Amino acid sequence: MTIQYYFDLIKPGIVLGNIISAISGFLLATHHEHHINYIILMYMILGTTLVIASSCVLNNIIDRDIDAIMDRTKNRVLAKNINSCFVKNSIIYAIILNTLGFLFLGLTKNLLTILLTMIGFLVYIGIYSLWMKRKSIYSTIIGSISGSMPPIIGYCTVSHTLDTGAWLLFIAFSFWQIPHSYSITIFRSQDYKKASIPTFNIKKGIKLTRIHMILCILIFTLANISLTVLGYTSYTFLYIISIMSIFWLYTGWYQYKQLDNDLKWAKKMFILSIVIITSLNVLLSLDSIFIFY
């Protein structure tokens, strides 16, 4: 077992994306505080990073059998190394990461931050990974709850309360997650069929899946508009994210008919979802700085 093995086990890309979201939530909340507590920010980043990393390790352990079947995941470290020694060491690694993560979060002296992190962890591992992913077409909805936790954790580390801003972040990020995940399940549908994982598009069809995606994008857009209407973000934020969301809607509804190819359309929707969530995080971070300067 090399350092590279342990690094790959935490799914660094997923960890990085979630930490960027946590930082954007933290910075958004600072526009009410008018200053940034860099020590608390550091504790939040370290703690959240380690807990998310432990979640990814445990997910790798739980999914190692289906990961070995799917083309998209067959090269993950535990899919290639499924003997008991690798699994045992990975479990110990996850426990260490998780313990250190909550110790750092304890240094924030914010019980709400710790509670939200615990909820995100338990939902992702206990409900999504261990149960619903293999059993239900609605697993994506459950996964979106844990996926939306990082920005709320960052926000509440500053605000110490689940106010309207926190709930709007929850709505925006969770409803972004659904069309993002559905895009993957559409253009990787053969993988999911091969691993016998039920997905919404396989069971209900592409037409209904696309309608769900459009509705989620609309709710995502309305949540971002509400952030500006209620004074959490600027009109510059509103203009940029609204234009991007409208293009996402256009691609979801009209370009589906133009492309006449489910896989090409789903890949385009997936790429757009990455561009939009990255832009959202950048805009939330920069907007909060410009507001109090």
Swiss-Prot record:
Membrane topology: Multi-pass membrane protein
Known catalytic reactions: heme b + (2E,6E)-farnesyl diphosphate + H2O = Fe(II)-heme o + diphosphate
Localization (cell): Cell inner membrane
Residue stretches spanning the membrane: 9-29, 38-58, 86-106, 111-131, 137-157, 167-187, 211-231, 234-254, 271-291
InterPro entries: Protohaem_IX_farnesylTrfase, UbiA_prenyltransferase, UbiA_prenylTrfase_CS, UbiA_sf
Pathway the protein takes part in: Porphyrin-containing compound metabolism; heme O biosynthesis; heme O from protoheme: step 1/1
Name of a matching Pfam family: UbiA
Keywords: Cell inner membrane, Cell membrane, Heme biosynthesis, Membrane, Transferase, Transmembrane, Transmembrane helix
EC number: 2.5.1.141
Chain's role: Converts heme B (protoheme IX) to heme O by substitution of the vinyl group on carbon 2 of heme B porphyrin ring with a hydroxyethyl farnesyl side group.
Protein family (similarity comment): Belongs to the UbiA prenyltransferase family. Protoheme IX farnesyltransferase subfamily.
Name of the molecule in the record: Protoheme IX farnesyltransferase
